[in-house]
Protein backbone atom coordinates (compact mmCIF):
# COMPACT_ATOMS: atom_id res chain seq x y z
CA UNK A 1 0.00 0.00 0.00
CA UNK A 2 1.36 3.39 -1.04
CA UNK A 3 0.28 6.47 0.96
CA UNK A 4 0.76 10.15 0.14
CA UNK A 5 1.00 12.50 3.13
CA UNK A 6 0.24 16.15 2.34
CA UNK A 7 0.91 18.90 4.90
CA UNK A 8 2.79 22.19 4.65
CA UNK A 9 4.33 21.58 8.09
CA UNK A 10 7.22 19.12 7.72
CA UNK A 11 7.09 18.12 11.40
CA UNK A 12 3.45 17.06 11.02
CA UNK A 13 4.31 15.04 7.89
CA UNK A 14 7.05 13.30 9.86
CA UNK A 15 4.70 12.59 12.80
CA UNK A 16 2.08 11.08 10.48
CA UNK A 17 4.71 9.13 8.56
CA UNK A 18 6.13 7.68 11.80
CA UNK A 19 2.67 6.77 13.11
CA UNK A 20 1.81 5.10 9.81
CA UNK A 21 5.11 3.19 9.92
CA UNK A 22 4.28 2.01 13.46
CA UNK A 23 0.95 0.75 12.07
CA UNK A 24 2.78 -1.20 9.36
CA UNK A 25 2.43 1.27 6.48
CA UNK A 26 5.99 1.85 5.32
CA UNK A 27 5.49 2.90 1.68
CA UNK A 28 4.86 6.64 2.01
CA UNK A 29 5.66 9.80 0.10
CA UNK A 30 5.27 13.44 1.09
CA UNK A 31 4.06 16.68 -0.47
CA UNK A 32 3.86 20.15 1.09
CA UNK A 33 0.59 21.27 -0.55
CA UNK A 34 -2.09 20.25 -3.01
CA UNK A 35 -0.29 21.85 -5.95
CA UNK A 36 2.64 19.50 -5.38
CA UNK A 37 0.46 16.53 -4.44
CA UNK A 38 -1.87 16.42 -7.45
CA UNK A 39 0.81 15.60 -10.07
CA UNK A 40 2.28 13.02 -7.66
CA UNK A 41 -1.14 11.39 -7.37
CA UNK A 42 -1.47 11.28 -11.16
CA UNK A 43 1.87 9.54 -11.63
CA UNK A 44 2.47 7.65 -8.41
CA UNK A 45 -0.07 4.82 -8.12
CA UNK A 46 -1.08 5.83 -4.59
CA UNK A 47 -3.61 3.77 -2.64
CA UNK A 48 -4.41 6.27 0.11
CA UNK A 49 -4.19 10.03 0.71
CA UNK A 50 -3.71 11.78 4.06
CA UNK A 51 -4.03 15.56 3.78
CA UNK A 52 -4.12 18.67 5.92
CA UNK A 53 -6.76 21.34 5.18
CA UNK A 54 -4.89 24.64 5.61
CA UNK A 55 -1.94 24.85 3.23
CA UNK A 56 -0.59 27.54 0.89
CA UNK A 57 -1.05 26.99 -2.82
CA UNK A 58 -3.82 24.42 -3.07
CA UNK A 59 -5.59 23.67 0.22
CA UNK A 60 -6.53 20.19 1.34
CA UNK A 61 -10.23 20.76 0.63
CA UNK A 62 -9.39 21.90 -2.91
CA UNK A 63 -7.13 18.86 -3.33
CA UNK A 64 -9.98 16.63 -2.13
CA UNK A 65 -12.36 18.21 -4.65
CA UNK A 66 -9.78 17.79 -7.45
CA UNK A 67 -9.31 14.11 -6.53
CA UNK A 68 -13.08 13.47 -6.50
CA UNK A 69 -13.49 15.24 -9.86
CA UNK A 70 -10.75 13.16 -11.52
CA UNK A 71 -11.86 9.90 -13.18
CA UNK A 72 -8.56 8.17 -12.35
CA UNK A 73 -8.42 9.33 -8.73
CA UNK A 74 -12.04 9.64 -7.60
CA UNK A 75 -12.06 6.28 -5.78
CA UNK A 76 -8.88 7.08 -3.77
CA UNK A 77 -9.58 6.94 -0.01
CA UNK A 78 -8.83 10.31 1.62
CA UNK A 79 -8.24 11.00 5.31
CA UNK A 80 -8.15 14.66 6.34
CA UNK A 81 -5.93 15.39 9.36
CA UNK A 82 -6.45 19.01 10.36
CA UNK A 83 -6.81 21.57 13.12
CA UNK A 84 -10.17 22.56 11.59
CA UNK A 85 -12.64 21.37 14.22
CA UNK A 86 -15.65 23.54 13.38
CA UNK A 87 -18.82 21.68 12.48
CA UNK A 88 -19.19 23.63 9.20
CA UNK A 89 -15.74 22.53 8.04
CA UNK A 90 -16.34 18.89 8.92
CA UNK A 91 -19.62 19.03 6.97
CA UNK A 92 -17.89 20.73 4.03
CA UNK A 93 -15.24 17.99 3.94
CA UNK A 94 -17.92 15.29 4.12
CA UNK A 95 -19.85 16.90 1.27
CA UNK A 96 -16.63 17.09 -0.76
CA UNK A 97 -16.21 13.32 -0.35
CA UNK A 98 -13.68 12.82 2.44
CA UNK A 99 -13.54 9.26 3.80
CA UNK A 100 -12.35 10.19 7.30
CA UNK A 101 -11.59 13.26 9.40
CA UNK A 102 -9.12 13.56 12.29
CA UNK A 103 -8.73 16.76 14.31
CA UNK A 104 -5.22 17.72 15.50
CA UNK A 105 -3.87 16.99 18.01
CA UNK A 106 -4.60 13.27 17.79
CA UNK A 107 -3.21 9.99 19.10
CA UNK A 108 -1.82 7.03 17.20
CA UNK A 109 -4.89 5.07 18.29
CA UNK A 110 -7.28 7.62 16.73
CA UNK A 111 -5.32 7.56 13.46
CA UNK A 112 -5.35 3.75 13.46
CA UNK A 113 -9.10 3.59 14.11
CA UNK A 114 -9.91 6.09 11.35
CA UNK A 115 -7.75 4.28 8.80
CA UNK A 116 -9.27 0.91 9.74
CA UNK A 117 -12.81 2.32 9.43
CA UNK A 118 -12.01 3.74 6.00
CA UNK A 119 -10.69 0.37 4.82
CA UNK A 120 -13.74 -1.43 6.22
CA UNK A 121 -16.03 0.86 4.22
CA UNK A 122 -13.91 0.81 1.06
CA UNK A 123 -13.44 -2.97 1.08
CA UNK A 124 -16.81 -3.91 2.54
Swiss-Prot record:
One Pfam family here: Response_reg
Protein name, entry field: Chemotaxis protein CheY
Keyword annotations: Chemotaxis, Cytoplasm, Flagellar rotation, Magnesium, Metal-binding, Phosphoprotein, Two-component regulatory system
Cofactor-binding details, from the entry: Binds 1 Mg(2+) ion per subunit.
Response regulatory domain ranges (all copies): 2-119
Gene Ontology BP terms: archaeal or bacterial-type flagellum-dependent cell motility; chemotaxis; phosphorelay signal transduction system; positive regulation of single-species biofilm formation
Primary residence: cytoplasm
Binding positions for Mg(2+) per the UniProt entry: 7-8, 52, 54
Species: Pseudomonas aeruginosa (strain ATCC 15692 / DSM 22644 / CIP 104116 / JCM 14847 / LMG 12228 / 1C / PRS 101 / PAO1)
GO cellular component: cytoplasm
Cofactor (UniProt): Mg(2+)
Annotated localization: Cytoplasm
Positions of modified residues (4-aspartylphosphate): 52
Chain's role: Involved in the transmission of sensory signals from the chemoreceptors to the flagellar motors. CheY is likely to be involved in changing the direction of flagellar rotation.
InterPro entries recorded: Bact_response_regulator, CheY-like_superfamily, Sig_transdc_resp-reg_receiver
GO MF, one annotated term: metal ion binding
